[in-house]
């Protein structure tokens, strides 16, 4: 018998963690939100919160043993994963410590997909110094992408068009790298037709479910807008689902995974994977009967998912801060919400820097183009001000 309530610890309390916390509270769970800064979005929902450096293994272990959760849900990559491996003997880690460790580093997930599973990816190589970078860049060819092996939300990513840009790209990647790693990945630039996320749900009954594919656009590697359903041929969708299942089956565990692909003609090229709700999946807050956060919690808690319904053409657009402030204020909600089938979700971040993601606008319409226009208009209506 599955006895509730469960005590859930979130490691990471940003906007995605906040929506996970909301979904958990609706199922009667006790939520403990953790992050490196106070008043993080999920902390505003949680029953309890802790502020500490989650990269510090001793601090992480101390907080986990003090709180004694039933389930630990990592919501970010910057974690002392060795502690999770040890803790996993006593406490459930979602999806598991191995998947968390593999997906926090671009080299590990890329090696798994390309080398172990023989899945098509962009051509890639690694470098730990400038001379290796120069050598591998000539082999891969220009243009190419340079990224830190450890980073998130596109931090440290550069599109390099010729060898004159290599030094600057190297310096940026090292500067923005998470932790002390000086390893970078060089990646072939794919001139793709479409970039998609396939939300893939592994359940405790052994079944795997898929949401309708989500198309998205990025700027410097960071999500800007998404739409659902993305238009794919049946054969392309089937290929993407097969690849997503192969990779997630290898990683194991339960929960929702965000699997990213490049689509070029009939070719499906694996890009990245997150073992948790995905930022591009924020569109599901309006597009589906169960959003990605509710699906994640149902899979984690062993609750049935009878069906996943994508209602109609839907889109999202991020709301970005235009200034740096510790006193966040904004206007424009009246205009943003004057359109039918439109909503705005502000994340409640306590401070902003220029370009920081502070919210998202979502909309439904008869067509994807109409939904995207509505979401764009709503997002543009929200303006940040100095009070």
UniProtKB/Swiss-Prot annotation:
<dbReference type="GO" id="GO:0004644">
    <property type="term" value="F:phosphoribosylglycinamide formyltransferase activity"/>
</dbReference>
<keyword id="KW-0547">Nucleotide-binding</keyword>
<feature type="binding site">
    <location>
        <position position="75"/>
    </location>
    <ligand>
        <name>N(1)-(5-phospho-beta-D-ribosyl)glycinamide</name>
    </ligand>
</feature>
<dbReference type="Pfam" id="PF02222">
    <property type="entry name" value="ATP-grasp"/>
</dbReference>
<dbReference type="GO" id="GO:0005524">
    <property type="term" value="F:ATP binding"/>
</dbReference>
<keyword id="KW-0658">Purine biosynthesis</keyword>
<feature type="binding site">
    <location>
        <position position="349"/>
    </location>
    <ligand>
        <name>N(1)-(5-phospho-beta-D-ribosyl)glycinamide</name>
    </ligand>
</feature>
<dbReference type="InterPro" id="IPR013815">
    <property type="entry name" value="ATP_grasp_subdomain_1"/>
</dbReference>
<dbReference type="GO" id="GO:0005829">
    <property type="term" value="C:cytosol"/>
</dbReference>
<dbReference type="InterPro" id="IPR005862">
    <property type="entry name" value="PurT"/>
</dbReference>
<dbReference type="InterPro" id="IPR048740">
    <property type="entry name" value="PurT_C"/>
</dbReference>
<dbReference type="GO" id="GO:0006189">
    <property type="term" value="P:'de novo' IMP biosynthetic process"/>
</dbReference>
<feature type="binding site">
    <location>
        <position position="272"/>
    </location>
    <ligand>
        <name>Mg(2+)</name>
    </ligand>
</feature>
<dbReference type="InterPro" id="IPR054350">
    <property type="entry name" value="PurT/PurK_preATP-grasp"/>
</dbReference>
<feature type="domain" description="ATP-grasp">
    <location>
        <begin position="111"/>
        <end position="301"/>
    </location>
</feature>
<dbReference type="InterPro" id="IPR011761">
    <property type="entry name" value="ATP-grasp"/>
</dbReference>
<feature type="binding site">
    <location>
        <position position="106"/>
    </location>
    <ligand>
        <name>ATP</name>
    </ligand>
</feature>
<dbReference type="InterPro" id="IPR011054">
    <property type="entry name" value="Rudment_hybrid_motif"/>
</dbReference>
<feature type="binding site">
    <location>
        <begin position="152"/>
        <end position="157"/>
    </location>
    <ligand>
        <name>ATP</name>
    </ligand>
</feature>
<keyword id="KW-0067">ATP-binding</keyword>
<protein>
    <recommendedName>
        <fullName>Formate-dependent phosphoribosylglycinamide formyltransferase</fullName>
        <ecNumber>6.3.1.21</ecNumber>
    </recommendedName>
</protein>
<feature type="binding site">
    <location>
        <position position="260"/>
    </location>
    <ligand>
        <name>Mg(2+)</name>
    </ligand>
</feature>
<dbReference type="InterPro" id="IPR016185">
    <property type="entry name" value="PreATP-grasp_dom_sf"/>
</dbReference>
<feature type="binding site">
    <location>
        <position position="195"/>
    </location>
    <ligand>
        <name>ATP</name>
    </ligand>
</feature>
<feature type="binding site">
    <location>
        <begin position="15"/>
        <end position="16"/>
    </location>
    <ligand>
        <name>N(1)-(5-phospho-beta-D-ribosyl)glycinamide</name>
    </ligand>
</feature>
<feature type="binding site">
    <location>
        <begin position="187"/>
        <end position="190"/>
    </location>
    <ligand>
        <name>ATP</name>
    </ligand>
</feature>
<dbReference type="GO" id="GO:0000287">
    <property type="term" value="F:magnesium ion binding"/>
</dbReference>
<dbReference type="Pfam" id="PF21244">
    <property type="entry name" value="PurT_C"/>
</dbReference>
<dbReference type="GO" id="GO:0043815">
    <property type="term" value="F:phosphoribosylglycinamide formyltransferase 2 activity"/>
</dbReference>
<feature type="binding site">
    <location>
        <position position="279"/>
    </location>
    <ligand>
        <name>N(1)-(5-phospho-beta-D-ribosyl)glycinamide</name>
    </ligand>
</feature>
<comment type="function">
    <text>Involved in the de novo purine biosynthesis. Catalyzes the transfer of formate to 5-phospho-ribosyl-glycinamide (GAR), producing 5-phospho-ribosyl-N-formylglycinamide (FGAR). Formate is provided by PurU via hydrolysis of 10-formyl-tetrahydrofolate.</text>
</comment>
<comment type="pathway">
    <text>Purine metabolism; IMP biosynthesis via de novo pathway; N(2)-formyl-N(1)-(5-phospho-D-ribosyl)glycinamide from N(1)-(5-phospho-D-ribosyl)glycinamide (formate route): step 1/1.</text>
</comment>
<comment type="similarity">
    <text>Belongs to the PurK/PurT family.</text>
</comment>
<comment type="subunit">
    <text>Homodimer.</text>
</comment>
<keyword id="KW-0436">Ligase</keyword>
<feature type="binding site">
    <location>
        <position position="147"/>
    </location>
    <ligand>
        <name>ATP</name>
    </ligand>
</feature>
<feature type="binding site">
    <location>
        <begin position="356"/>
        <end position="357"/>
    </location>
    <ligand>
        <name>N(1)-(5-phospho-beta-D-ribosyl)glycinamide</name>
    </ligand>
</feature>
<dbReference type="Pfam" id="PF22660">
    <property type="entry name" value="RS_preATP-grasp-like"/>
</dbReference>
<keyword id="KW-0479">Metal-binding</keyword>
<dbReference type="InterPro" id="IPR003135">
    <property type="entry name" value="ATP-grasp_carboxylate-amine"/>
</dbReference>
<keyword id="KW-0460">Magnesium</keyword>
